[in-house]
């Protein structure tokens, strides 16, 4: 018989830098999960990723206090800011543009994000990423 799911916990943790301090400790502690065991497993799973990049993770906690987790790809906004070399997006994206990216850069980001996107193909994924870029005040060159 399958284990009974007690909770799903969604967090964004920097790759390779999970530790028992907030937000990880309190979120897992109130569910009775072994915090250090999760931190070691998460850090091992994100070891090959760029250190410090925020990684969304969904932790499934079972009634016997065991857990499993699924790591997702970094948020598109973080990847766009990194590609554009900016600290934050524009406060007024319609009037003030903060950076320019071309289609090839968006394709690279779309390839990274593809597993988590519902887009049918790469072109649709690029359009989705371009929409995120425009909402951040990043100008997209070469997209019709």
Curated annotation (Swiss-Prot):
One or more lysine residues are methylated. The keyword Ion transport does not apply. Transmembrane segments: none annotated. Pfam families: Ribosomal_L11, Ribosomal_L11_N. InterPro entries: Ribosomal_uL11, Ribosomal_uL11_bac-typ, Ribosomal_uL11_C, Ribosomal_uL11_C_sf, Ribosomal_uL11_CS, Ribosomal_uL11_N, Ribosomal_uL11_N_sf. CDD domains: Ribosomal_L11 (cd00349). It comes from the Bacteria. GO terms for biological process: translation. GO terms for cellular component: cytosolic large ribosomal subunit. Keywords: Methylation, Ribonucleoprotein, Ribosomal protein, RNA-binding, rRNA-binding. GO terms for molecular function: large ribosomal subunit rRNA binding; structural constituent of ribosome. Belongs to the universal ribosomal protein uL11 family. PANTHER family: 60S RIBOSOMAL PROTEIN L12 (PTHR11661), LARGE RIBOSOMAL SUBUNIT PROTEIN UL11M (PTHR11661:SF1). Part of the ribosomal stalk of the 50S ribosomal subunit. Interacts with L10 and the large rRNA to form the base of the stalk. L10 forms an elongated spine to which L12 dimers bind in a sequential fashion forming a multimeric L10(L12)X complex. Forms part of the ribosomal stalk which helps the ribosome interact with GTP-bound translation factors. HAMAP family: Ribosomal_uL11. This is Large ribosomal subunit protein uL11. It comes from Legionella pneumophila subsp. pneumophila (strain Philadelphia 1 / ATCC 33152 / DSM 7513).
């Amino acid at each position: 018989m399958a284990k009974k799911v007690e909770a799903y916990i969604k967090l964004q943790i920097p790759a390779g830098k999970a530790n028992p301090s907030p937000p990880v400790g309190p979120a897992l502690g109130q569910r009775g999960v072994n915090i250090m065991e999760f931190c070691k497993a998460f850090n091992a799973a994100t070891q090959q990723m760029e250190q410090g990049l925020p990684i969304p993770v969904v932790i499934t906690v079972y009634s016997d206090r065991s857990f499993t987790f699924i790591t997702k790809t970094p948020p598109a906004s973080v990847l766009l800011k990194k590609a554009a070399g900016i600290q934050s997006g524009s406060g007024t994206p319609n009037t003030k543009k903060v950076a320019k990216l071309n289609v090839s850069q968006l394709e690279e980001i779309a390839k990274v994000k593809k597993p988590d996107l519902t887009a049918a193909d790469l072109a649709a994924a690029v359009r989705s990423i371009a929409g995120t870029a425009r909402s951040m005040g990043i100008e997209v060159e070469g997209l019709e």
